[in-house]
């Protein structure tokens, strides 16, 4: 279905009964083709991590339950889920009676797997689970004194490097782009870990800032950045993790890595989540 038929950017009515058809799929292939990414031979592994903070249902006695969920959509899924449709879908459980939290978890995982055409994993937690705030790992480059005059479209010529091999981890909290349809801002903290030619931190920060007025979905921004770095420095290893702030009760955190046996970063929330 074309994106114009989705509920994104439109006035919506919240349904008071569970409805899996609310989930709206967006094929990954269109954006990947534009980036020169072969969907049958992806240059990365990883997941899109969806954290959901507005999750509720009713038990058999009519008593409401609330919780939070974390769901992992693999990068080799055929589709992603449009975020507003996911919000409306989750809220359709508000008056839905379930036997247990495990049943709710099973239903959601099955529905997400069906719409993405991949095996989605995840867990649902009670809200009294204690979670500490973390900080992005690596060296922060935001304090660099640079002059910026490009806020979009992203300029991959700014991904400059030095002819010296390094292994380093850098991060920035200055990433911002905008929803492709609504124009709402997506604020993100990004962590780049790589082994290869040394990125010039000042020009790379300018590159990240060049997304500021750009309109693209979060997952697609992540793959654009990953591709631009990979094409520029041809690293022996590269991983990218973006933690986006919460919008509509959901935050999306894409992770991409050249390492098939990757380990996910710490799941500690950052202060802006």
Swiss-Prot record:
Source species of the chain: Rickettsia akari (strain Hartford)
Keyword terms, alphabetized: Cytoplasm, NADP, Oxidoreductase, Queuosine biosynthesis
Record-annotated active site: 179 (thioimide intermediate), 186 (proton donor)
Reaction(s) this enzyme catalyzes, per UniProt: 7-aminomethyl-7-carbaguanine + 2 NADP(+) = 7-cyano-7-deazaguanine + 2 NADPH + 3 H(+)
Gene Ontology biological process terms in this record: queuosine biosynthetic process; tRNA modification
One GO MF term: preQ1 synthase activity
Binding residues annotated for substrate, in chain numbering: 81-83, 218-219
Descriptive protein name: NADPH-dependent 7-cyano-7-deazaguanine reductase
The gene coding this protein: queF
Metabolic or biological pathway, per its Swiss-Prot or TrEMBL entry: tRNA modification; tRNA-queuosine biosynthesis
Pfam families per UniProt: QueF, QueF_N
The keyword Oxidoreductase is annotated on this UniProt entry: yes
NCBIfam families: QueF
Protein family: Belongs to the GTP cyclohydrolase I family. QueF type 2 subfamily.
One Gene Ontology CC term in the entry: cytoplasm
Binding site for NADPH: 83-84, 247-248
Quaternary structure, from the entry: Homodimer.
Purpose: Catalyzes the NADPH-dependent reduction of 7-cyano-7-deazaguanine (preQ0) to 7-aminomethyl-7-deazaguanine (preQ1).
SUPFAM superfamilies membership: Tetrahydrobiopterin biosynthesis enzymes-like (SSF55620)
Annotated localization: Cytoplasm
EC nos: 1.7.1.13
């Amino acid at each position: 279905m074309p994106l114009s038929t989705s509920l994104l950017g439109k006035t919506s009515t919240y349904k008071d009964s569970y409805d899996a058809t609310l989930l709206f799929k967006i094929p990954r292939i269109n954006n990947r083709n534009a980036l020169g990414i072969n969907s049958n031979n992806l240059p990365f592994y990883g997941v899109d991590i969806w954290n959901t903070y507005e999750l509720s249902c009713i038990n058999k006695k009519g008593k409401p339950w609330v919780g939070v969920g974390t769901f992992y959509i693999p990068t080799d899924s055929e589709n992603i889920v449009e975020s507003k449709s996911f919000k409306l879908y989750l809220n359709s459980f508000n008056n839905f009676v379930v036997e247990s939290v495990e049943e709710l978890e099973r239903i959601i995982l099955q529905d997400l797997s069906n719409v993405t055409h991949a095996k989605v994993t995840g867990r649902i937690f009670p809200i009294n689970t204690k979670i500490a705030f973390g900080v992005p790992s690596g060296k922060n480059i935001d304090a660099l004194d640079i002059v910026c005059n490009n806020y979009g479209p992203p300029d991959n010529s700014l991904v400059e490097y030095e002819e010296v091999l390094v292994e380093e981890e850098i991060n920035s909290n200055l990433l911002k782009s905008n929803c492709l349809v609504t124009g709402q801002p997506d604020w993100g903290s990004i962590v780049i870990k790589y082994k290869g030619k040394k990125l010039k931190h000042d020009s790379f920060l300018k590159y990240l800032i060049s997304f500021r007025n750009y309109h693209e979905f979060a997952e697609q921004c992540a793959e654009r950045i990953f591709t631009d770095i990979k094409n520029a420095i041809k690293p022996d290893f590269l991983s990218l993790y973006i933690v986006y702030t919460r919008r509509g009760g959901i935050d999306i955190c894409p992770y991409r890595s050249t390492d098939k046996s990757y380990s996910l970063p710490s799941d500690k929330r950052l202060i802006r989540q």
